[in-house]
């Protein structure tokens, strides 16, 4: 269940959010590790405590950060009773409590699920999503996001994302210890060990990216399970999201939003900055119906570059994702 590729970026899953927040955690932990090393109070246990604490704090306050960055506000039932009923019905089918419905004032069509014990669960839709998709397509996107909440993907990815950060900063701090505390009697042994830890953290992170992509497929399956003809609806919604994002980028309508979108674009269903690059073929297929567009994309042969880009992505390749949805139809 996951994705970024040369043709188009996919349903943004809650998991990409966690990946973005992990970057913030990592940078903060790095600063603390440097300080602790330089002042002479560094040890493995203290660094581990710092990493754990920062992960927990980041997770707890992340809804507030997301709300500020994306101008998210709660959408009252009076403003959009139909959307509230839709999410309520899908939540019942998903056998979860209805999350808070949020609206992000962004013209690019997208949606995301997030939350913490302090705020509860949220599903946010952008203004652009409501303006672009029809009712069935919005249902498919929301069903995908509810799948992330049902499967507790936020919590799972938060826990596993902590591990590579821990090993990386242990390795980095070992290198700092060798450089700044005069430990040269080991002939650079601690520095080599530190490099080994950093390489291991990178390898571990590749497995975590793979896990994230699997959970994207899992969320897609959930959307299909709670909707009639869900596979087709989710497929067409993805095609329309990419087409519209590309058009908005080309006309420059989202320029004022781009700095924020670029900073935390991993939170989204699809990468708004990659829409032009990821949809070269879409320019040729622009006038085709959404169903024809889906068929064109699923027939595309994946290149080595496509597969390589997917390996470093939190989401699956769009072609593979659409093919998986076809198998569920």
Predicted regions and their residues:
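Hydrophobic or amphipathic, alpha-helical segments that drive membrane association/targeting
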Residues: 1-116, 161-213, 217, 230, ...
């Amino acid at each position: 269940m996951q994705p970024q590729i040369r043709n188009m970026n996919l349903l943004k899953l809650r998991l990409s959010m966690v990946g973005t927040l992990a970057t913030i955690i990592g940078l903060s932990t790095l600063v603390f590790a440097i300080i602790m090393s330089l002042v002479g109070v560094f040890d493995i246990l203290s660094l581990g405590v710092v990493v754990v604490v920062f992960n927990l704090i980041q997770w707890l306050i992340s809804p507030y950060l997301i709300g500020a960055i994306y101008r998210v506000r709660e959408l009252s039932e009076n403003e959009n009773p139909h959307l509230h009923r839709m999410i309520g019905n899908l939540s019942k089918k998903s056998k979860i409590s209805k999350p808070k419905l949020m609206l992000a004032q962004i013209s690019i069509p997208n949606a995301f699920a997030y939350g913490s014990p302090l705020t509860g669960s949220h599903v946010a839709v952008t203004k652009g999503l409501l303006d672009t998709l029809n009712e069935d397509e919005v249902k498919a996107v929301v069903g995908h996001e509810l799948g992330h909440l049902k499967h507790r993907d936020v919590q799972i990815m938060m826990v596993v994302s902590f591990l590579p950060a821990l090993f990386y900063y242990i390795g980095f701090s070992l290198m700092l210890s060798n450089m700044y505390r005069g430990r040269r009697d080991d002939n650079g042994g601690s520095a080599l060990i530190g490099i080994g830890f950093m390489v291991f953290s990178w390898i571990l992170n590749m497995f975590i990216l793979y896990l994230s992509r699997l959970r994207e497929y899992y969320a897609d399956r959930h959307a299909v399970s709670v909707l009639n003809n869900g596979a087709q609806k989710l497929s067409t919604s993805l095609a329309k999201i990419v087409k519209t994002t590309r058009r908005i980028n080309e006309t420059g309508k989202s320029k004022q939003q781009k700095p924020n979108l670029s900073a935390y674009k991993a939170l989204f269903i699809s990468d708004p900055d990659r829409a032009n690059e990821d949809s070269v073929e879409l320019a040729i297929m622009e006038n085709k119906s959404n169903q024809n567009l889906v068929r064109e994309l699923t027939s595309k042969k994946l290149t080595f570059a496509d597969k390589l880009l997917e390996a470093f992505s939190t989401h699956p390749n769009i072609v593979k994702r659409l093919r998986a949805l076809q198998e569920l139809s």
